[in-house]
Structure formats: C-alpha cells, structure tokens
Amino acid sequence: NCCIPAPEPAVDCKIPPDSVMKGKHGRRTQESIDRANELLDKFVKTLEGRGIKVDRPTPLKFDEKIATPDWEVEHMFGCMPSRDVIITVGKEMLEATMSFRCRWFEYLAYRPLLQKYFIEDPGMRHETAPKPRLTDKDYHMNYLSEDVSIEQRLKWAEKKYFVTTEEEPLFDAADILRFGKDLIVQHGFTTNLKGIDWLTRHFPDHRIHTVNFPGDPYPIHIDATFTPIRPGLILNNPVRKLPQEQRKLFEDNGWEIVYAAQPAHNSPPDLSYYSVWLSMNVLVLDPCLLYTSDAADD
C-alpha cells in the first residue's frame, strides 16, 4: 500500500517544479509495489545467506486517510527504512519525532518488533521522543512557492533557513550518524535546532555535533550526503560539501573525508523522491564489505 504523499508543507517543498510527481499522489502502481517487494525479498535472502537475522516491519493501511486534532492528510507515505524512524544507541531504540505529517504514524509498523525486543532482552530500552503537533506553525509556508529558484533555495540553505521552524523539537533518525560516543546530526528540512537540543539532553553521555551542507537545496536525511564506510574513512557528496570549519572535528580525530564518485545515472527514476546520489546510501556489513544500489558507478 505504499503511496505517493498527498500535498502537505514538508512534502511540497521537496518536489522540484519540473518533476513528474507534481500534482500526483495516492497508492503506487501494483507493478511497482510488487517489483519493490521482489527486490526486498531477494536482498533479505542475500543477508540471511551471510548468517544475518532479518526482522521486517508490519505493514499498515498506508493508503487510508489519517488525522490528528490539528490536521488530516489523504494517506500515509509507506514503510520506509527503519533508520528513518528509529535510532539505536547502545541498548536503546529511540523513536524519532518525524517531520512529515504523512509519516506521523509510521512508527506503528515497528511497534510489534520493538515489543518483541523488549520482551526478549531485559536490558533493552524502548524510548519515544515527544510527538510534535505539526501544525502550520512548524513550517515556513513560503517554501511552497513554485516561484522560488534553486539559487534562492541554496542561499536559504547556506543561511540555515529551512522549511521547518523552531516551533517544537523535530528530528528524523536518518539525520543522525553514530561514531561511538559522538552523534553527528544534520540540521536541515527534517531536523531542527530544537530537535538537536532535545537529543543533546536525552543523550547526556554522548557528544552531539551539528553539521549542515550548504550545497543541498533539499537537505532531507544525511545518508546520501555524508557516509562513514569504515573506521577513519567517510564519503562526502561532492555537490554537498561539508563546510571547512566543520571538517576540523573529523580531520583532528584521524578521519579522512573523500568525495564520492559520480553516480551511474543522470536522473532519478520517475515518481521517485530520491536523487541520483542514492548511490551513496550504502549498507556496511563490515570494514571490507558494503552493499550499494545499481545507482552507483562501477
């Protein structure tokens, strides 16, 4: 039941004016859903073949209307990667606030697994961040204008002016990278400064470092921008470079930052929210083995 999201403040600003997704929303085609499930099933078998136990979320009725006392949207998004919704730090699994209305209830797909882990492991901690109301006060509505050029969006990104306001704490788990006792958090569309402040208070035994990438006019999640692939080595998107003053933290601690190769594709698939830089979104199994999509350059 995966869907193309209906219009809402956090979603609209992500869709470029020339995208074929403009004006389209609703349940994705059965063909695309079946193909995605086929790829997922194949990947699960690959991981299980390496002795890895794979747990999968419980689907919801993503194509039905959802609402809170403050808003309603025609349907949900779908069940995206668990790392969007949940950040695991030691024995704790923390549900993020999320910043898209269509993803507000997505955590429910993972609740059966979280309950299972809680029962099986006496040391497991299941935590949830305060759910935001996501009223219009949470968004800069001028971000919705189709008249805003990419050049203007880049200027806004450089000034750290994003679609989300500081009305209440907001963060997606996919904006967080874990480096032992250091957590790197991207400030952008889906995580605001109040969200980073909340994380700082919640993890007092960790050091929280805020980063941003001025070259990204749509800064949603850090995975296709800044990716650690083994101890001491990080891939950085050459279009979304980490500012020089923020590189110092990594370089002073022995981390080399290298720019990723150009993706094999020049444009993302139709009806896709992802950029060609999805090639950087890899799964690292160990320091010598990682999995990437076919968007990567050989």
Describe the predicted segments one by one:
Residues 1-298:
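The feature marks the mature, well-folded catalytic cores of soluble enzymes
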